[in-house]
């Protein structure tokens, strides 16, 4: 192909890709009653997701906005899909806006370096025991929880997610550029939230935002931050 034709072709393809991205990203909307939300596509086996997790929730809590988690277990990770299905199970064991499921995700991220496909079940049992939850003999026998994980993954593919974490700050009228793989600090997210809040259209306030963006325990946050820095708690 001649150089100038190749350049034109690449330009057209890039324009089409950007157009498709904008259309696809528009499917992301805050939950009812919220003007702004954080959307996170994550993989429980992903080290960058573990690093981003406390920053996301701290920023969300500071701004009193909800976090919308989507499972995106990467095929190269051999236990992340099973962990995501178990997180969905723990979601069903608590009526407080998935509080127990989010605590399980936090727990997995905090212990991620020690978890393997071979010992994952032991960590799940330990978490269940600590939280006085009885585990089923067979998790998700009808495949409904796995189907939800797969649906999240399919949505991610639809809107162009390829890496984890991929994070958007969205409003009811706009979508930020995505943060992909790396979240440097809480201020980065906070600035994006402030920008989205300015762009958002008026909306009814969430009566109890803490139920949608639950606070992480300080001890757990400190433990997570130390582990991310390579310091034992």
Where is each model-derived feature located?
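Extracellular/periplasmic catalytic domains that process cell-envelope and extracellular macromolecules
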Residues: 31-32, 60-62, 79, 158-163
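Boundary at the C-terminal end of the N-terminal hydrophobic targeting segment
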Residues: 20-25
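Short active-site neighborhood of thiol/selenol oxidoreductases, capturing the structured segment around
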Residues: 32-46, 67
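C-terminal cap of thioredoxin/glutaredoxin-like
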Residues: 53-54, 125-233
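Positively charged n-region of N-terminal signal peptides that target proteins for export
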Residues: 1-7
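Structural alpha/beta surface segment adjacent to cysteine/selenocysteine redox centers
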Residues: 44, 50-128
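Bacterial N-terminal signal peptides
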Residues: 7-19
């Amino acid at each position: 192909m001649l150089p100038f034709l190749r350049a034109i072709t690449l330009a057209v393809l890039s324009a089409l890709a950007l157009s498709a991205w904008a259309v696809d990203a528009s499917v992301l909307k805050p939950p009812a009653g919220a003007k702004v939300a954080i959307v996170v596509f994550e993989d429980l086996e992903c080290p960058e997701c573990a690093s981003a997790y406390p920053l996301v929730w701290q920023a969300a809590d500071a701004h009193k906005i909800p976090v919308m988690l989507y499972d995106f277990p990467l095929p190269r990770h051999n236990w992340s899909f099973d962990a995501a299905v178990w997180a969905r199970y723990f979601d069903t064991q608590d009526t407080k806006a998935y509080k127990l499921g989010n605590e399980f995700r936090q727990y997995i991220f905090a212990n991620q370096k020690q978890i393997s496909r071979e010992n994952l079940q032991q960590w799940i049992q330990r978490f269940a025991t600590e939280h006085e939850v009885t585990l089923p003999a067979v998790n998700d026998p009808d495949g409904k929880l796995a189907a939800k994980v797969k649906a999240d993954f399919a949505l991610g593919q639809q809107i162009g997610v390829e890496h984890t974490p991929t994070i958007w700050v969205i409003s009811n009228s706009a979508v930020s550029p995505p943060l992909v793989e790396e979240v440097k600090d809480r201020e980065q997210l906070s600035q994006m939230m402030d920008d989205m809040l300015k762009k958002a259209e008026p909306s009814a306030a969430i009566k109890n935002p803490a139920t949608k963006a639950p606070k992480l325990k300080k001890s757990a946050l400190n433990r997570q931050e130390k582990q991310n820095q390579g310091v034992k708690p």
